[in-house]
């Protein structure tokens, strides 16, 4: 028997191995692709930071996030959560900060009737800065659809949401007196209006392959002043007629962005009011608002006075006055405030005019006549007196996800 086993071994026979049958693979079902419309709806609800991350995760996602439909939908969603934008020069750099515009009902305010003070400062969110090497801007136009126009050594367009900026080639003529920013909602075009020292007006359209400047006819030579707003395709700004030495040389210039033509709206605005006045959106109508102060004490604010434009064709203004309570003037003596705009809830917003500590903003409700005072913390040290620059504060700022390439201009990442 042993011989047989040995022979079997020599002949190379192997013992039988038990083979286990492999289970059949179940067919793998591929997940259904998510419809583009659903992706766009989800992306539109993300924060601007999350949208930026999604651009980097997938080329397909990035292509979706560049679509015009998504940009417009995100703007629509962002309009429901407007922000207040702050910008100022800080040792040569222009800084941008923002904060939610709507008051937080959970915040703890003092229980004074009709006058509330926030006990804790609100931290503003840092957005971007304007490099010192590019020059400092003296003029900052109000944001339109999240974009900001600044005039420095060159005119620049900023998008604080994407932290991009773009140069715009200036006119060949030197000595630009002023720069304004407008938007045409029909053709969906941004335009820059420029006025030279010889009062010649020119306009340029963003997004074109070659930036060109066109001369615009202007029948009334004028000096543009400090306040402007773009509403329904019309750029409004306060102005003073050149050579007019009458007590009322002021008016509102109205530039129709799409048709590129001027109209001038005379109004009753005196010299003593011009420094504390502003053009605002009052319930969908253009209005000019200013502060009435006590003759004996210029720091004592008595009321807000508004002129509301009821008829553009016949230039008819109506007057509204909101009297301020006496406790409004129980503020620190060194606070110098200016009107910065009006919210959709009917609140006139004022802010400290210069960057200093503490920095305040105020909400005055034209509905309840209540006042809320907030202290804002920018997380920086107070600048020295000779570096205490003017603060530009804007209401109704919305975030814009459009990248520089969408405007057809080269960008500088911040």
Swiss-Prot record:
Transmembrane segments: none annotated. Residues 1-24 are annotated as: Disordered. Residues 28-77 form the F-box domain. Signal peptide: none annotated. Disulfide bonds: none annotated. InterPro entries: F-box-assoc_dom_typ3, F-box-assoc_interact_dom, F-box-like_dom_sf, F-box_dom. It comes from the Eukaryota. SMART domains: FBOX. This is F-box protein At3g47030. It comes from Arabidopsis thaliana.
């Amino acid at each position: 028997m042993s011989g047989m086993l040995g022979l079997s071994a020599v002949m190379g026979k192997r013992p039988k191995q038990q083979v286990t049958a492999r289970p059949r693979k179940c067919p793998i079902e591929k997940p259904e692709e998510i419809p583009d419309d659903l992706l766009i709806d989800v992306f539109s609800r993300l924060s601007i930071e999350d949208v930026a991350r999604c651009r980097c995760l997938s080329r397909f996602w990035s292509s979706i996030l560049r679509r015009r439909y998504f940009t417009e939908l995100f703007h629509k969603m962002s309009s429901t959560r407007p922000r207040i934008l702050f910008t100022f020069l800080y040792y040569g750099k222009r800084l941008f900060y923002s904060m939610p515009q709507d008051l937080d009902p959970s915040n703890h305010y003092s229980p004074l009737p009709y006058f509330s003070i926030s006990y804790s400062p609100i931290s503003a969110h840092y957005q971007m800065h304007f490099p010192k090497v590019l020059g400092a801007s003296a003029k900052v136009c109000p944001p339109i659809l999240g974009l900001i126009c600044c005039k420095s050594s060159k005119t620049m367009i900023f998008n604080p949401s994407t932290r991009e900026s773009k140069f715009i080639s200036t006119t060949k003529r030197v000595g630009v007196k002023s720069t304004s920013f407008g938007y045409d909602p029909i053709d969906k075009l941004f335009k820059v209006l420029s006025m030279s020292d010889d009062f010649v007006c020119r306009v340029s359209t963003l997004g074109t392959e070659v930036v060109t400047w066109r001369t615009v006819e202007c029948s009334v030579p004028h000096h543009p002043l400090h306040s402007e707003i773009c509403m329904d395709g019309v750029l409004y700004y306060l102005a003073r007629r050149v050579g007019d030495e009458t007590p009322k040389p002021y008016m509102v210039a109205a530039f129709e962005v799409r048709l590129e033509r001027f109209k001038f709206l005379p109004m009753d605005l005196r010299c003593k009011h011009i420094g504390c006045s502003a053009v605002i959106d009052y319930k969908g109508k253009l209005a000019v608002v200013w502060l009435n102060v006590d003759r004996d004490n210029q720091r004592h604010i008595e009321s807000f006075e508004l002129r509301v434009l009821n008829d553009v064709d016949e230039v008819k203004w109506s007057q509204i006055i909101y009297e301020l309570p006496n406790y409004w003037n129980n503020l620190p003596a060194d606070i110098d405030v200016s009107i910065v705009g009006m919210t959709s809830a009917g609140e006139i917003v004022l802010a400290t005019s210069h960057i200093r500590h503490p920095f305040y903003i105020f909400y005055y409700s034209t509905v309840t006549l209540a006042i809320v005072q907030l202290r804002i913390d920018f997380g920086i040290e107070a600048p020295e007196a000779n570096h205490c620059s003017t603060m530009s504060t804007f209401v109704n700022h919305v975030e814009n996800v459009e990248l520089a390439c969408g405007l057809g201009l080269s960008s500088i990442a911040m």
